[in-house]
Amino acid sequence: MMLRVLLVAILALAHGYVAPLGFARSSSPALRRRALAPLAQQPSTDDVKAAETNAEAEDGSGGLRQLLGLKGASAGDEKAFLNWKIRLQLTKPATWVPLIWGVACGAAASGNFHALWNLFGDAPTTDSVGVVATDAVKAFCAMVLAGPFMCGFTQTINDWFDRELDAINEPYRPIPSGAISELEVYSQIAFLLVGSIVVALQLDGWAGNDWPVITAIAAFGSFVAYIYSAPPLKLKANGWTGTYALGSSYIALPWWCGHAMFNAGSISAPEVVLTILYSIAGLGIAIVNDFKSIEGDRALGMNSLPVAFGIDTAKWICVASIDVTQLGVAAYLWAIGETWYAAVLAGLVLPQMFSQISFLQDPVNNDVKYQAAAQPFLVFGILTTALAVGHHTF
């Protein structure tokens, strides 16, 4: 039993970088009402998926899945103090991983982060254990802002606006199951939003930023999270705007936050451009998750790229946005003299392209396999780029 639970935890963390890009998406209330009526009257792929999801909790991992906000979670524990398990589930902790990683990449790109290995090596160093420990705590606090607060706010507000769709696909989720009240949801959204701004202000002060860069990033991220999920803009209803909003929120914004925590004044225009480009790769990751939900998206009026262009065209848009972005970044690093980093990044693209061979043959059934095989290389490619930026003098 313990081995099974441990395995679920490891898979959840590994899946965390791509899971956020595939969580529930829905259209306007009017479209949902029209679409959900026939779906509720007949067995659909979504109904089957929900049934399978609920059955997964029987393997003994339902409790852990609940805490991580994953499918197959067990029912809520009404005896939990302040309903904390349900509240935590609503923030989907498994989806915090990419933002935490983004903060780490931003810290690396700052060129001013003192890691543990700075205390060792052949070259003399003036770093002390105190400096290393302080920077570690700074990075951790920035990760708390990006993960529990900002991502938690995003997932909570997204679940609220997706509550009708979740009633079919994931009826055990906190909101459709009635495990948490409307007032409790509103209070959680308010707490996470206000908490994000307060924490960001404190981090700006700790970092010594003359202008509240981190607070501005937090405020902008909160705004993007709202217009992504809520009408009338509801960016997620459009394949292009929705997927790019996700990509930028999970790559560019936490990167900037991590950098600003250690050296806000050194954020250069080329670095901003690189992170925005990597957000295009994030768009490709998001498309991977859209292939299995084509029928549901079409019924709900969701104009995802596979719906808009068809599977054959969308799959090429997907891999092209991922590969061309990374190869373009590698070419840029080579051009500015960071040849070793460029070579490593190009090398990390190759296994991704190899995994895309089977994905392109059947993107509907090979999406999970592709994500598991390719995404780790993309993630380390982002870190490689960050290290190159930190090493280079612009």
Predicted features, each with a name:
Residues 1-31:
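N-terminal chloroplast transit peptides
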Residues 4, 32, 60-64:
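Short amphipathic alpha-helical segments that mediate assembly, nucleic-acid/protein binding
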Residues 11-13, 37-38, 151, 348:
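A composition/secondary-structure signal for short, hydrophobic, low-basic-content segments
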Residues 19-55:
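N-terminal, immediately post-signal peptide pro-regions of secreted/luminal proteins
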Residues 42-394:
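Multi-pass alpha-helical membrane architecture of UbiA-family
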